[in-house]
A protein has these predicted regions:
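A transmembrane-helix-recognition feature enriched in membrane-embedded lipid enzymes
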Residues: 184-210
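A structural signal for short, hydrophobic/glycine-enriched beta-strand patches
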Residues: 30-188
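Electropositive, surface-exposed helix/loop patches at the edges of structured domains
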Residues: 17, 129-135, 155-162, 205-230
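A general structural signal for short secondary-structure boundary/capping elements
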Residues: 99-104, 170-174, 193-200, 217-222
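Low-complexity, compositionally biased segments
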Residues: 77-80, 136, 167, 193, ...
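N-terminal membrane-anchoring alpha-helices
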Residues: 1-50, 209-216, 223-229
């Protein structure tokens, strides 16, 4: 009969304990390092504290019955605040449109269009599946050099880390406008997402799912709407 003889060796338990320690300690260390980086990031909850930037980048979030969820609505409202107060000249809406059954960017675009934004100033990225995709594509496809990232506080440290890694000038607009029912779950999910982001950038050098030809943010964004309302 086959026996697991290695289980009787003390060295096995030493190595197993060491591996287990790394699996627990590494994500905690990464989480703290992201928070430390964020302490040195320009961040605010009001447009008055923002420095002018080229574009407000709004990552997608859940939509319900083709309407933005509270989390997403607050992000969009903050982006509109930045635009109408002259802090940004463009708005880039980046979300998941990878299925005919789910489309984040169409409700985002329709919401922005209802709020007196020049159509030429609105850009849509249909392949913003993750924050990594959103930021790398903003730089590589839309030729963005400086941005204000509009999202809730819990997600901002990861975005700041990614932006720092790829060389984007980054400001964080914390779009928390209420207490969200998803709050505790979001923090747990974000804990692991930060570890994945660290691994993506430092070990695997992960690229976005899709790249493509440049479409500079300085022009008109109307052609990027295809698949949303066109």
């Amino acid at each position: 009969m086959f026996r697991f003889k290695f289980l009787k060796k003390p060295k096995f338990y030493v190595w197993a304990g060491f591996v287990l320690f790394l699996l627990v300690a590494a994500p905690i260390a990464i989480d703290f390092s992201f928070e430390e980086l964020y302490l040195h990031t320009e961040r605010f909850q009001n447009h008055r504290s923002a420095r002018p930037a080229t574009v407000a980048v709004v990552p997608g979030a859940s939509v319900y019955k083709n309407e933005p969820s509270p989390v997403l609505k607050d992000r969009l409202d903050c982006a509109l605040e930045l635009y109408h107060q002259g802090k940004v000249r463009k708005i880039l809406l980046s979300g998941d449109n990878g299925s005919i059954y789910y489309n984040e960017v169409k409700p985002m675009l329709l919401y922005i269009l209802k709020n007196e934004v020049n159509e030429r100033d609105i850009f849509v990225d249909h392949a913003g599946f993750r924050t990594l995709d959103t930021l790398v594509r903003a730089k590589e496809i839309f030729q963005v050099k400086d941005l204000i990232f509009v999202s809730q506080r819990v997600y901002q440290p990861r975005a700041a880390f990614l932006a720092n890694k790829i060389g984007l000038k980054f400001q964080a607009f914390e779009a928390d406008r209420r207490i969200y029912t998803s709050g505790p779950f979001s923090r747990i999910r974000e804990f692991f997402a930060r570890t994945l982001a660290w691994v993506d950038m430092n070990l695997f050098k992960t690229n976005p799912k899709y790249l493509g030809d440049p479409f500079p943010i300085e022009g008109s964004g109307i052609k990027t709407w295809k698949g949303s309302v066109l």
